[in-house]
Amino acid sequence: MSNVVIVGTQWGDEGKGKIVDLLTEQADMVVRFQGGHNAGHTLVVDGKKYILHLIPSGIIRPGKQCAIGNGVVLDPAALLAEMAKLAEVGVAISPENLKIADRTNLILPYHNALDQAREKKKGEEKKIGTTGRGIGPCYEDKSARRGIRLVDLYNPALFEEKLRENLDLVNFLLKNYYHEEGFQLADIRDDYLRMGDQLAPYCEDLAPWLEQAQAEGKNILFEGAQGALLDVDFGTYPFVTSSTTNASGACSGSGVAPGKLDYVLGIVKAYTTRVGSGPFPTELECADGQYLAKKGHEFGATTGRPRRCGWFDAVVVRHSARVSGLNGICITKLDVMDGMSEVRLCTGYRIDGKETAYVPADTAKLDRVEPIYETMPGWRESTVGCKNWQDLPAAAQAYLNRLVQVVGVPISILSTGPDRSETLIVQNPFHA
């Protein structure tokens, strides 16, 4: 039995979906433990593309059990739409292969409205750059103990009471502070009770279910969303998401004890990208950045927004390794850098004339850091589909070796293309 956690080490979009899909071959179960439908995982299997937002990537493989943990915030309408889309392409979903934690907090229509109204009021200069899908306001309600959970839909009187109390506050804010329309209780109540009936067969007390699976010796893969620099505590606050994106979130977001985790794999893009607002020390606003964006198809799977691109930042990935306790890293999208005459990696920062190897908590400081770069020769040869280390161009090998040196965590997996077959496995996390 092994419990493996997969986390992003940058600002999300590192390519976690493909690696989860790859490792699901050895897993019996895949558990999504945080985030919502603001995150998107893109998989390419046998030339067919799948984009998932809530359902764990393991759902594509027959015979695997998947679960949405209590750390996720769930929009029932978005989940049902995703299930329907998967059914259209032949992926059958049933209570046999998908469970949803009964403690999962629900995103309601007013969460979306609050999210969008807040961004609008902040304006272009100060907005966070959220997806506007209600993630932050839902987590806010959860922390304030006014959240509505999946289990509440099966007690209609309690659900209506909670909804009424919340709407008293929400409608006051929307109408009087944001000058937006409010909501009618009956409309939300009826829609959510109907969707609750549809999801009832999937509802599960997840912690005992996972405990039983561990007792039976099953391999469990825990799938994170976003990345460590979007973590609500250790990210570039306030330009972050509202959940725990590091490895500790796998425990609080599923009910599995910390001592049960065996291996933490960090997914690392060979360069760096970010969607939305916030500091980005190695951002490239030049031809190299445009090259990476175009060749890497750097557009968000959820929003379609173009991603900001930059050189690899070892300070950021070391920070991620520290807070998640990484055992190994998986490098993705190395092939995107094929054809560049030279490549650079950031090994440290200079702030107000002083060098540091750490990500400062002060966002204003991070905004003005000067990256300390090492420049290395690029490679003209293609790395696409390389499955042996010796097949990689010498310059690509040198780049990866230096990357490992400055990060301090060994490479477990190297991805050289979008398909699951385009992968070089150095150490399988389930066999570590």
UniProtKB/Swiss-Prot annotation:
CC annotations in GO: cytoplasm
A single MF term (Gene Ontology): adenylosuccinate synthase activity
Cross-referenced PROSITE patterns: ADENYLOSUCCIN_SYN_1, ADENYLOSUCCIN_SYN_2
InterPro entries: Adenylosuccin_syn_GTP-bd (IPR018220), Adenylosuccin_syn_Lys_AS (IPR033128), Adenylosuccinate_synth_dom1 (IPR042109), Adenylosuccinate_synth_dom2 (IPR042110), Adenylosuccinate_synth_dom3 (IPR042111), Adenylosuccinate_synthetase (IPR001114), P-loop_NTPase (IPR027417)
Record-listed IMP binding positions: 13-16, 38-41, 131, 145, 226, 241, 305
Cofactor note: Binds 1 Mg(2+) ion per subunit.
Names of the cofactor(s): Mg(2+)
Residue positions binding GTP: 12-18, 40-42, 307, 333-335, 415-417
Alphabetized UniProt keyword annotations: Cytoplasm, GTP-binding, Ligase, Magnesium, Metal-binding, Nucleotide-binding, Purine biosynthesis
Active site: 13 (proton acceptor), 41 (proton donor)
Binding site for substrate: 301-307
UniProt keyword S-adenosyl-L-methionine, yes or no: no
EC class of the enzyme, as a word: ligase
Binding residue positions for Mg(2+): 13, 40
Enzyme nomenclature, EC number: 6.3.4.4
Catalytic activity: IMP + L-aspartate + GTP = N(6)-(1,2-dicarboxyethyl)-AMP + GDP + phosphate + 2 H(+)
Localisation per UniProt entry: Cytoplasm
Stored NCBIfam families: PRK01117.1, purA
Subunit comment: Homodimer.
Protein name, UniProt field: Adenylosuccinate synthetase
Organism expressing this protein natively: Magnetococcus marinus (strain ATCC BAA-1437 / JCM 17883 / MC-1)
